[in-house]
């Protein structure tokens, strides 16, 4: 049996379902680039038929990602499969992932069909997808609660129809490792054509078993694991891929399998997903938590000083954690900034050097010394800014006392400068009142977060907001050494997204009227 475990990442599809607001196309592309650097084999980029935004995201990622195979999800419905193929066709090679429910409760209460009908629908869907690509994956939704006879029948039929990967999801996180491993083992024992497909698993974490179930499945013969970075996902989340990768690396002698993951990219990828998704990583999380390599016990510290292996089964360096060297200042040139970006593994097509260098100089003038993590934060925020941003903050002045604060701003609105001043319950409130007055948008803030990016009193601060506008939620991000300015950038990020959506809607309406 092949000892290579395929890593299938669904952060951009299943993981995004956990977010308060959808990621933008640019945000998804940043994450896709990071997953490609990480060495992920398959990137499930979205569900194209679900929305125009998802279609565009899948299409954009398929066009730009070269070293990982891009995949799109579809129900076992022809129009879904057609939409997936249309979005993916710009890729050199791609995968279509189609699925249907197989558990008794899903078949009877959700689909309201006979099992014979469901098998026929699955076969038809796989054959339809094979018209577009040889790489078709079929998932038995809620396989963990599917009667084993029915599951074996469905798997055999899907393989005969042309599926080359069969995914066995524990959709509601119901099983335990011995049980789930037994399901995989039974499939290998009872499905006659099982050798013609790779068996994949997709485990949810409702009972905290997703990683353990996935490892049990590998031991039973599964050779693809699906999951997300940091384990983000619907309800309690998905199998955390960074944990799977490090378990396989650390216990390779026991498990006898490998992955193509570049382990020293794990920490950076985890932080990026956390930042763009506005989902903090719990400090005690395995592998990537802030305390994952901390030792506070005196007995442990004594042992570590004598021999690190006494209490450390893996090193911080193995996931890419390293001490940050300080060697960039306002006197550093573009070549020095580019050299640091190169050393961190970023390709030139992943960022705009001119925009990054401009932001770097502003930061260096403020704090004097710039670390690699500062550059990364600046790059991520710079990438989120659109060249066609209608609203841009040109000037900000704050006067704050113990009771009220006054803020004055100059805002570029499509090139025209507008000024406003306001009083509020603190500088951020006053700033937001100014922006609301100039732009005319009535926005409800659902969530406001401030987090430190980097170290020290002069470190960067990141503002994240979730805003509600006409029933739709938007995520805005801002980064600055000044948290008031970062807060303003976050709101303008949202307002520019709303403005672009309004412009697109107006164009569509004009086309519709012209057609009529």
UniProtKB/Swiss-Prot annotation:
Gene Ontology MF: a single term: 2-isopropylmalate synthase activity
Major localization listed first in the record, in broad terms: cytoplasm
Pyruvate carboxyltransferase domain ranges (all copies): 5-267
Annotated residues for binding of Mn(2+): 14, 202, 204, 238
UniProt key word Cytoplasm: yes
One cellular component (GO) term of this entry: cytosol
Localization, UniProt: Cytoplasm
Function statement: Catalyzes the condensation of the acetyl group of acetyl-CoA with 3-methyl-2-oxobutanoate (2-ketoisovalerate) to form 3-carboxy-3-hydroxy-4-methylpentanoate (2-isopropylmalate).
Name of the protein in question: 2-isopropylmalate synthase
UniProt lineage: Bacteria, Pseudomonadati, Pseudomonadota, Gammaproteobacteria, Vibrionales
Gene: leuA
